[in-house]
């Protein structure tokens, strides 16, 4: 029987449940391939609305299912090389987690017993739009946490909102060091489960100093926003320490992000005297630049140091310029597929190729790594909580300063009060193997995280300008 009090509450709530259906309609429009996932989230969305209006929802709901919001580029220039592989890696790892198919130590079903639902949504549109999206996912859908974010600009925009809304957020990919060095110096809810851009620049400088010590200089072409600026700054400062004989140009090229056309910049690079060219281009910008540069013989005249070229390697195939120094922002993508022989990498690579018909790249690994970080933290917290579903504070405590195994590398949450990940790194030279029919890397050097990341408590610029004291490179 339903008493009068309950009837009154239901009469108040039911008209408002249109909020849920409207939100799901918008989600389905964002990515029609995700319809079945969106529809399965209806129960969770209703629970969030009921809770908002003061109707108690049993703990069993939370234990049975958790919802992770996963932002990535589904449209625009960031989608083909970054966003879609990130989405694919997310879908693969979550499906396997729910079925208990991930190799040890993640071979239990679900996350702390809960099946995982993912709301994968479009990161395109800029910072203001993404702040709105973030608020909507928390306040209207009641998601448990976020895992993802490709763009440094997006991370810079949503960091304060994540702390304001007290929502656990694991940055999987965005690279700017500013997140914890300037924007959120005492983070609670925000984590990053991989190294930041300083590691890329320092590892590359070590590689250049070792392999290209006789080069006459270096210049750069980088996107004119946080990621590009930080990438060039850190590489340039590291070169001043590790290879002061190789001089950097002050006349680098700074096109806006997603510019798409680089005729003037390519002309300037062809005229520049420096042997080496640094670029942190990614996504559609990287591929457009490569095609335009190939047409003008740019890669035959300069040696390119490409910190994110690993994302484009399999897409470009034979058209990937031979001889570029290729980065994948860690031991991900081509480095893991070719060089890391562990049960986890073998499983992930085989499952990804079987499902999507292509090799997993850097963002596929990084997004899966963030999801594994969530599984690790929730299950560690649940174990400490007597097997009960943990609170957000308990999950945070479990992840702070912890070490967990990603798909391709160990992740140590060892910087920024235990919120910034530290991982190993790799650099090598790319070419195309005709027999394999795949791009490969050779002359590879590996770098430990403590060699290429600032010690805890020291910001990147201070560390680099001070001669990188405390780096452990033995």
What are these regions (language model features)?
Residues 283-288, 336-402:
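Extracellular/periplasmic ligand-binding modules, especially the Venus flytrap/periplasmic-binding
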Residues 35-45:
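Bacterial N-terminal signal peptides that target proteins for export
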Residues 49-60:
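C-terminal segment of classical bacterial N-terminal signal peptides
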Residues 70, 137-150, 168-172, 218-222, ...:
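Periplasmic-binding protein-like
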Residues 63-67, 81-85, 100-181, 193, ...:
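Beta-alpha junction/loop-to-helix N-cap segments that form part of ligand/metal-binding clefts
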Residues 129-132, 177-178, 186-296, 338-340, ...:
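Extracellular/periplasmic Venus flytrap/periplasmic-binding protein
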Residues 66, 322, 402-474:
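Solvent-exposed, acidic/polar segments of extracytosolic/periplasmic ligand-binding ectodomains
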Residues 69-93, 121-127, 150-151, 221-229, ...:
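Extracytoplasmic "Venus flytrap"
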């Amino acid at each position: 029987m339903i008493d009068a009090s309950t009837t009154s509450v239901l009469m108040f709530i039911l008209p408002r449940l249109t909020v849920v259906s409207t939100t799901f309609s918008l989600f389905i429009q964002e990515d029609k391939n995700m319809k079945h996932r969106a529809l399965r989230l209806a129960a969770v969305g209703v629970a969030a609305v009921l809770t908002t209006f003061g109707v108690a929802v049993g703990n069993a709901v939370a234990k049975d299912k958790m919802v992770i919001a996963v932002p990535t580029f589904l449209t625009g220039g960031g989608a083909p090389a970054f966003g879609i592989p990130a989405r694919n890696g997310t879908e693969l790892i979550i499906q396997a987690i729910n079925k208990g198919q991930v190799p040890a130590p993640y071979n239990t079903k679900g996350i702390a017993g809960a099946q995982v639902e993912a709301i994968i949504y479009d990161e395109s549109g800029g910072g203001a739009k993404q702040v709105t999206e973030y608020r909507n996912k928390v306040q209207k859908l009641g998601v448990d946490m976020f895992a993802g974010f490709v763009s440094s600009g997006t991370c810079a925009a949503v960091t304060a909102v994540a702390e304001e809304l007290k929502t656990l957020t694991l940055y999987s990919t965005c690279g700017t060091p500013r997140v914890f060095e300037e924007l959120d110096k005492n983070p609670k809810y925000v984590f990053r489960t991989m190294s930041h851009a300083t590691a890329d620049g320092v590892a590359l400088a070590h590689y250049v100093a070792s392999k290209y010590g006789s080069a006459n200089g270096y210049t750069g072409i980088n996107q004119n926003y946080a990621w590009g600026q930080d990438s060039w700054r850190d590489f340039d400062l590291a070169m001043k320490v590790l290879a002061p004989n190789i001089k950097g140009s002050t006349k680098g090229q700074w096109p806006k992000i997603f510019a798409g056309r680089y005729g003037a910049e390519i002309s300037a690079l062809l005229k520049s005297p420096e042997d080496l060219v640094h670029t942190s281009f990614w996504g559609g910008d990287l591929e457009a630049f490569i095609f335009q540069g190939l047409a003008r013989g740019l890669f035959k005249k300069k040696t390119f140091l490409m910190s994110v070229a690993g994302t484009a390697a399999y897409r470009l195939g034979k058209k990937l310029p031979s001889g570029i120094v290729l980065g994948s922002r860690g031991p991900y993508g081509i480095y893991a597929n070719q060089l890391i022989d562990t049960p986890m990498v073998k499983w992930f690579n085989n499952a990804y190729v079987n499902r999507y018909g292509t090799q997993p790249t850097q963002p596929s690994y990084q997004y899966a790594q963030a999801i594994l970080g969530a599984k690790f933290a929730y299950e560690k917290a649940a174990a400490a909580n007597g097997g009960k579903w943990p609170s957000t504070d308990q999950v945070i405590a479990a992840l702070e300063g912890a070490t967990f195994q990603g798909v391709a590398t160990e992740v140590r949450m060892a910087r920024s009060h235990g919120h910034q990940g530290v991982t190993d790194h790799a650099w090598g030279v790319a070419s195309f193997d005709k027999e394999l029919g795949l791009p490969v890397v050779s002359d590879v050097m590996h770098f430990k995280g403590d060699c290429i990341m600032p010690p805890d408590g020291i910001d990147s610029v201070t560390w680099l300008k001070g001669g990188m004291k405390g780096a452990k490179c033995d």
